[in-house]
Each structure stands twice: as structure tokens, then as C-alpha cells.
Amino acid sequence: MDWQKITEKMCDFIQEKVKNSQSQGVVLGLSGGIDSALVATLCKRALKENVFALLMPTQISNKANLEDALRLCADLNLEYKIIEIQSILDAFIKQSENTTLVSLGNFAARIRMSLLYDYSALKNSLVIGTSNKSELLLGYGTIYGDLACAFNPIGSLYKSEIYALAKYLNLHENFIKKAPSADLWENQSDEADLGFSYAKIDEGLKALETNDEKLLRTLDPSLIAMLKNRMQKNAFKGKMPEILEI
């Protein structure tokens, strides 16, 4: 892939969305993971300024992720704010009848979304998305949580392509080497949740997208079954609510 042209196209897209909305800039959640780090880097290239990052850890968040996020803010000279969301999460735990790890992870994602949109209004800026194509196809995210945004410059790149672009843009090796994780709970791992590496997942997704029957026959049947199941089950996450026409 021509990463120079792709980078230019992404930066043009960011500039266009901000200009057409008459906004001042963008707001993003910076987790310390590769996706948000890449988006922050693209925003800085595209806008130079008016890029505001929110860092929103809980008490179980990986401290190394916060350190990496802070280093990136320093390297890019980004305006940022750290908001500890544990007290909000604790209030939910006291009231909710559903406190499974998945439920708490989803609620944490929606807390972060609420804060992002609060600062979006405060700063007259757009919330920019950080989900990649692999996550979007699988519905691997929280509806009205981390999937919520005004626009998304990286949603057409598979996770494996995210790594390639990150290397091209010289992101710190910490982002490239760390295991993919939404950091929703302690020691949470995307690949452990999904049961396969992103390399395998992307291979399967591409084969399904192009209907490459020859390649599909060579892949693990359990991988293809998992991908099809998640894509079908979570398809609603990528759609606007259906409205009855009268």
C-alpha cells in the first residue's frame, strides 16, 4: 500500500470534516493503544493545533498505557487532560444489578464517550473515532461507547494495516510492540477475547470480504465461523436506529 498517499488522504479528510462542520478542531480519547496514538498523530499532521486529548483511566488501567499516552502528548505537543473515571464507575457498581466484567467494560466505554462529547461541546470540536476496520466489521466495541464519533479516519484499515501505517509514521515502538487491548479490565486482551491473532482475523475478514473461496477453504473453519457469527450478531452496531415510516 502507498502509505504516503493514504496518509495525505486521511489528513485531507480530517481537515475537510473540521472545516465543513465549522468546528475549531477535534477531541479524542487517548488510551495508550496503537489506534488512538495513530489517530492523534494524523490529527497533529492535519490540523497542527486544536487537537485535544482526554486520558480517562480507571484504577485497573494499565499504567504503561497511561505513560505511553503522556509521552505521545509531549512528543506531539498536544493539549490534554487526565480524568480518572473510577469514581463514576464505582457509583454505577453500587446501583447496577449487572456488574460482570463485560458490563463494567461497556459502562466505562460509555463514561468516556460522555466525557468526550462534553468536551466536544466545550471546545466546539468534533469527536474523532479511533476504531479500525477489523473492530468495526466484527462489532468489537461498545455501541454508544468507543464506537461513537463524528467521523473516523482509520475505519477502512484492518488492524494489521494499522501497524504498517504506524511504522511508516514512526510511532514509538511501545505502541507497535504491545499486545492489542481495549484495557476494559485487568489483563484484558483483544486476541484472547476473539480467540485468534489479528493476523489470522484479518486474513479471514479479507477472504470473506472478497469472497475468495479458494483462500477460505484453507483457513481454520472455527475462525471463519467466529467471524461470520460476530459479523452477523453485531451488525446492528454499525447502523443508525431504524425509524418506522408512516
Curated annotation (Swiss-Prot):
Catalytic activity: deamido-NAD(+) + NH4(+) + ATP = AMP + diphosphate + NAD(+) + H(+)
Annotated EC: 6.3.1.5
Highest taxon above the source species: Bacteria
Biological process per Gene Ontology, one example term: NAD biosynthetic process
Ligand binding (Mg(2+)): 35, 135
GO MF, one annotated term: NAD+ synthase activity
Function summary: Catalyzes the ATP-dependent amidation of deamido-NAD to form NAD. Uses ammonia as a nitrogen source.
Subunit structure: Homodimer.
Protein name as annotated: NH(3)-dependent NAD(+) synthetase
